[in-house]
From Swiss-Prot:
The gene is minC. It comes from the Bacteria. Interacts with MinD and FtsZ. Cell division inhibitor that blocks the formation of polar Z ring septums. Rapidly oscillates between the poles of the cell to destabilize FtsZ filaments that have formed before they mature into polar Z rings. Prevents FtsZ polymerization. Belongs to the MinC family. Keywords: Cell cycle, Cell division, Septation. PANTHER family: SEPTUM SITE-DETERMINING PROTEIN MINC (PTHR34108:SF1). Disulfide bonds: none annotated. GO terms for biological process: cell morphogenesis; division septum assembly; regulation of cell division; regulation of cell septum assembly. The keyword Cell division applies. Pfam families: MinC_C, MinC_N. Gene3D superfamilies: 2.160.20.70, 3.30.70.260. This is Probable septum site-determining protein MinC. NCBIfam families: minC.
Length: 221
């Protein structure tokens, strides 16, 4: 029997959702550039769904938004929570309408494996633990990036960037023996160096997400 040349099957994927809260394209572009500068390689080529629930103006420039994203090598696959007029405009430029439902609000799949790196992560290096927790037995230097869909445990000093819950896991944590990070992020919520200093993160600590805000808890050395 001849194998069919194509098959249509249902599946699920983790997509980042970009919430738009302004009609001003210049403001959107500037804030997007600021976020991309934090971890450019992590966001490069990332597929996005744009949430327009906060936009009521029917003259919102969806085409302009699409150009802003594509010019920065981000891929907009569709929109969600838009008013009927904006939904119509989006369809006219080839964007899908993504409906929210039980499948969209369900918890991300919890990582089932652990990736262990038994060495220092140096400037310019990026370690990504896909669908896994990440353990670093060593330090993470300035300019280095460690990313995990699950939690990140660092048995050393964190000086670079650590991004846990990259697949949307809001229960992920970041733990390190000493935190001097350039950036920490859990499920898209992030702190920069100044935020860490303001919240007293310096020695051994555990960073987690509570609601929409990060918190840090000191751990015994």
């Amino acid at each position: 029997m001849q194998t069919p040349s194509l098959e249509l099957k249902g599946s699920s994927f983790t997509l980042s959702v970009l919430h738009i809260n302004s009609n001003d394209m210049a403001v959107i572009a500037a804030e997007l550039d600021a976020k991309l500068a934090i971890a450019p390689q992590f966001f490069l080529g990332a597929p996005l769904v744009v949430n327009l629930s906060a936009i009521q103006a029917t003259d919102f420039d969806i085409l302009g938004l699409k150009e802003i994203l594509t010019n920065r090598q981000l891929i907009i696959v569709g929109i969600t929570s838009a008013c009927p007029e904006l939904t119509k405009q989006a369809k006219s430029i080839g964007l899908a309408t993504v409906k929210t439902g039980k499948e969209a609000t369900s918890q991300p799949q919890m990582p089932k494996t652990t990736k262990i790196v038994k060495q220092n992560v140096r400037s310019g290096q990026q370690i990504y633990a896909k669908n896994a927790d990440l353990i670093i037995v060593g330090a993470v230097g300035n300019g280095a990036e460690v990313i995990a869909d699950g939690s990140i445990h660092i048995y050393g000093t964190l000086r670079g960037k650590a991004m846990a819950g990259a697949g949307g896991d809001r229960h992920a944590v970041i733990m390190a023996q000493k935190i001097e990070a350039e950036l920490v992020s859990i499920a898209g919520q992030y702190w920069l160096t100044e935020n860490l200093q303001q919240n007293g993160a310096a020695l051994s600590g555990c960073i987690r997400l509570e609601g929409e805000s990060l918190t840090v808890e000191s751990l015994p050395l």
